[in-house]
């Protein structure tokens, strides 16, 4: 019985650490996204990185490939200024992978809400680097 308790306790501690690391990644993801820092934003990901948006699936194999996209001009043309997490709920966790159901809000420069979206982020520990490995969103 003691051995089971010890193993369970060890597993719970690892899961708590995984959740803490995953949430830090999402904090950095949003901060670098809002700062429009493509290089920093790309460092919050693990590769290959997969994004499901609408009916489209996009895979970026490398950080360099991801850094080459220019998402900020398109978003700014919609009135977007910044985004924020409204909720983040862990739905699955292991020592090296955390699935997080999120809701985020897009805002204009006067902090007026534009749109709200649900999404799923899969954050992984790959070779000692915690990053978003995949995300699926109802955002375009």
Predicted regions and their residues:
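Hydrophobic/aromatic beta-strand elements that line small-molecule binding cavities or substrate pockets
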Residues: 86-91, 103-106, 118-124
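A short hydrophobic beta-strand element
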Residues: 82, 96-104
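A solvent-exposed, acidic/Ser-Thr-rich amphipathic alpha-helical stretch
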Residues: 38-89
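Short beta-strand edge/turn micro-motifs at domain boundaries
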Residues: 114-140
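Short, low-complexity N-terminal intrinsically disordered segments enriched in polar/charged residues
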Residues: 1-43
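Detector for glycine-centered tight turns/loop "hinges" at secondary-structure junctions
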Residues: 55-57, 111, 128
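Short, cysteine-centered beta-strand-loop-beta hairpins and adjacent loop/turn segments enriched
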Residues: 78, 106-114
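A mature extracytoplasmic/lumenal domain signature
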Residues: 45, 55-56, 102-104, 121, ...
């Amino acid at each position: 019985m003691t051995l089971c308790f010890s193993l369970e306790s060890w597993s719970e501690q690892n899961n708590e650490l995984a959740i803490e690391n995953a949430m830090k990644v999402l904090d950095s993801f949003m901060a670098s996204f809002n700062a429009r820092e493509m290089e920093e934003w790309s460092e919050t990901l693990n590769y290959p990185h997969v994004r499901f948006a609408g009916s489209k699936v996009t895979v970026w194999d490398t950080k360099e490939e991801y850094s080459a996209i220019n998402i900020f001009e398109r978003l700014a043309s919609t009135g977007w200024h910044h985004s924020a997490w409204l909720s983040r709920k862990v739905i699955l966790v292991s020592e090296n992978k955390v699935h997080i159901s999120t809701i985020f809000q897009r805002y204009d420069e006067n902090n007026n809400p534009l749109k709200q979206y649900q999404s799923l982020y899969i954050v992984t520990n790959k070779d000692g680097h915690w990053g978003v490995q995949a995300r699926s969103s109802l955002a375009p």
